[in-house]
Amino acid sequence: NAMTAAGITSMRGAAEALQDVAEELSQRRQEVIGLNSSGITVASPAGVMSYYLPEGTDDTIENVRACNTGVVSTAQHEAEELRQASIQGTSANGRTVDQILTDIDVHRDNPIYAAAFINTLGGAQPYLALLSDIDRNNTGRPATTESAASTLGHILGAASQPEVNGSRLGADFSNIVTDMHSVEEVAVFNALTTQPDVVYGTDFLVSAADALEELDPAKIIPGDTIYLTSQYSHDPLAGVLYAMGSNPAAALAYLGGGGQVDAHGDWEPDEKTLQRWKRLKSRGWNYDEQDPTSKKPTAAEGFTAALAAASSYRNPNDPSDKNAARADAAATYASGMGVDYFSSNSWSRRQFTETMQKNLSVVIDDACCDLRSADIHSDTQCHALAPCENDRCLRC
């Protein structure tokens, strides 16, 4: 049959539409290639190379460009400009640290921008040094230092996300802190990881804590007193544990650890987890060394925040869900170990800050009636830690 004019027009339209789709796909592919050439790899959980778009953003090529290669050059420029100002007071363009930070805040939560920013500086050590330099060269201006800690903490949080391979940063930063084991690096890293409105990547936190638990807080080398060392904890675990309080998955992975559920539904931790708890329960928690006026979290407050986050996996809505049951068992174990430790003779009532009591109240409310893993069967021990508003404790 001869083709009609309408048919030809329809086919031409379909071909043009396919060509448009192919062009858009090609442009997206170029975005991925452009990111890779900048040292940034964006991948899905399955490992498929991709690009980044914030939640709720339309997947148009204009938005793809703006959120990916469009922010790389901006990050590179602003990182270098902030480095100049951190040492000289102003950048080559005459801008102050505060002015540059205001511009950086526009993109600070974009993982692409964040990864490019840290890469431009040269990685973990120069990143820690950047905040130290800002602090050291802005004596008497704590607001500038705190603003820098907030901005750089957000950038680290964005760069720590899995879609930009942020898990490796946990090892990178903890290795620098461990190798230097000086109070300045510890306090600066704690400042970066105790920003209350940042959720850091799960693997980033777990890998960092895994390394930092090996660092004895009693052997941290003293250093110069700057604002950050007077305000933030000198305990290497303080920051990452506090950050786990906002990331329950990281808290459970670290405190519940690896293991398996036995025939009774209880958690059987693996050897690494047993050794971790042995270290956590035998180390000192009084090496914060902060100024008495400081309101920044202590290491023990971070520890109890992580325990509270992990305990949120207790009592799942659907006990038949195997993953939920596994998480419940691990959370019960972690909660039991935590309550057992904080109700022991290692702690006196006067050592519990208001924050610690609040965190432990959450743990107790979730789990004080089912702490078989820690052999706790009395509400006396529950109430020794913090007031429990859950009347289930009366039946412990």
Where are these regions (language model features)?
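Active-site cradle of extracellular carbohydrate-active enzymes
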Residues: 196-224, 228-230, 237-301
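Sequence-level detector for tyrosine residue identity
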Residues: 51-52, 113, 127, 200, ...
